[in-house]
Amino acid sequence: MTSLRELSESDLEGVVEINNAGYPAVPLVTLEEIRSLYELSSYRMAALNDKGEIVGFALAMNPGADYDSENYVFFEGRFENHLYIDRIVFADSARGLGLGTALYEHLFDFARTQGRTAVTCEVNLEPPNPGSLRFHRRFGFEDVDTQATKGGSVVVQLLQAPLA
């Protein structure tokens, strides 16, 4: 059986491994960088397989976080009351198990209980991540804009899902 639980600091080394195995769909991170993201995040959730092992995670931030990501800054300038998903990553072994759906349903519920009016995120267009774009479309994410980041080496689709 699969489940979700709050991430803890002791999980972060495993989170780095899962994250970096997802490259180039997600940027590589060090333990220090993931710890900083963890500390900035108001939503920190792990997805577990039937053995209780972390096979995926999500980190998301409230408005007003002291975060200098080009994408977060873009949304901060356009949305007053959003929950920004910095990353959602799964190990290959977790794909197709419904964990992404479970995690996003939980995240959207969290955003609603926080009184947020939208969930925001970005998905890579270059390098392409078509699976993630399809996944986000299923949750009602709509195009806001595109943006070149990291000196033009990455192009992202900026997305938002309005919350009713």
Task: State each model region's role.
Residues 101, 125-145:
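Conserved active-site alpha-helix within GNAT-family acetyltransferase domains
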Residues 2-15:
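A short beta-loop-alpha structural element at the N-terminal edge
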Residues 111-125:
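Conserved GNAT acetyl-CoA-binding A-motif
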Residues 24-51, 59, 65:
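Active-site rim helix/loop that mediates acceptor-substrate recognition in acyltransferases
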Residues 86-95, 125:
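A short, internal acetyl-CoA/4′-phosphopantetheine-binding micro-motif in the GNAT/acyltransferase core
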Residues 77, 146-164:
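C-terminal "cap" of GNAT-fold acetyltransferases
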Residues 90, 96-109, 138:
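Conserved acetyl-CoA-binding loop-helix of GNAT-fold acetyltransferases
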Residues 59-87, 151:
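Conserved acyl-donor/pantetheine-binding loop and adjacent beta-alpha core of acyl/acetyltransferases
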